[in-house]
C-alpha cells in the first residue's frame, strides 16, 4: 500500500510539472553566441526561427543510453523583431519537453515545459548575436526525451498567428511520419 501512495505522489508531481506554465524566452534572458549559421544540414527552420542542430538527433544511433531520459542540446536562433511560440503536441508531451531557453534550470522531464514563446530582441536592441551580419537572438536549451527515442510533433505559431505550422521531429527515433493537420 505504501508503494502505491509513493507512486501516486510521483505521478501527481510529474503531471503537475508537465502542466506548469513557463516563462517566455525574451531578450532579457537570452544567451550570446558568436557568428552563427541559421540554416545548416541539421537545421529545422520555420520562418524566422531556427533550431540549428536538432536534425542531427534524428538517427536512432543518437541515443546515448542514459536512463530514464536524456538531454538533447539544441539552441534556438530567432531573427530580430519576431515572436514564435513552439508547442509539443499530442502524446509526445508525456515523454518529451523543452528545457532551458531562458527558463528555469534542469535537464529532466520534470524540469521541462511543453510550450515556449520566443521573443527576439527588437530591431534596434543589441542581442549580442548575429547570422551573416544580421541580428538574431540566441537561447541555449534543448529537449528532455525518453531513452527509446520519440517522434515529436511541434506546432509553430509565428508572429502571433493563430494558425500553426506543424513539423514532426525525430529525437533518436529514426524516420518519423509526416505531420497531420495542425
What spans do the regions from the language model cover?
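Non-catalytic macromolecular-recognition regions in eukaryotic signaling proteins
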Residues: 15-182
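Secretory targeting and sorting signals
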Residues: 1-19
Amino acid at each position: 500500500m505504501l508503494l502505491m501512495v509513493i507512486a501516486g505522489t510521483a505521478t501527481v508531481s510529474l503531471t503537475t510539472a508537465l502542466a506548469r506554465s513557463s516563462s517566455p524566452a525574451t531578450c532579457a534572458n537570452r544567451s550570446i553566441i558568436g557568428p552563427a549559421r541559421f540554416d545548416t544540414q541539421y537545421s529545422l527552420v520555420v520562418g524566422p526561427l531556427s533550431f540549428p542542430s536538432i536534425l542531427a538527433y534524428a538517427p536512432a544511433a543518437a541515443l546515448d543510453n542514459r536512463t530514464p531520459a536524456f538531454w538533447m542540446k539544441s539552441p534556438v536562433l530567432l531573427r530580430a523583431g519576431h515572436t514564435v511560440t513552439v508547442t509539443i503536441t499530442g502524446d509526445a508531451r508525456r515523454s518529451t519537453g523543452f528545457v532551458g531557453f531562458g527558463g528555469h534550470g534542469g535537464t529532466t522531464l520534470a524540469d521541462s515545459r511543453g510550450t515556449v514563446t520566443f521573443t527576439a530582441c527588437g530591431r534596434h536592441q543589441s542581442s549580442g548575436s548575429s547570422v551573416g551580419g544580421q541580428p538574431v537572438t540566441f537561447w541555449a536549451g534543448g529537449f528532455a526525451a525518453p531513452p527509446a527515442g520519440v517522434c515529436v510533433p511541434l506546432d509553430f505559431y509565428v508572429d502571433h498567428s493563430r494558425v500553426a505550422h506543424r513539423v514532426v521531429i525525430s529525437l533518436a527515433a529514426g524516420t518519423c511520419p509526416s505531420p497531420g493537420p495542425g
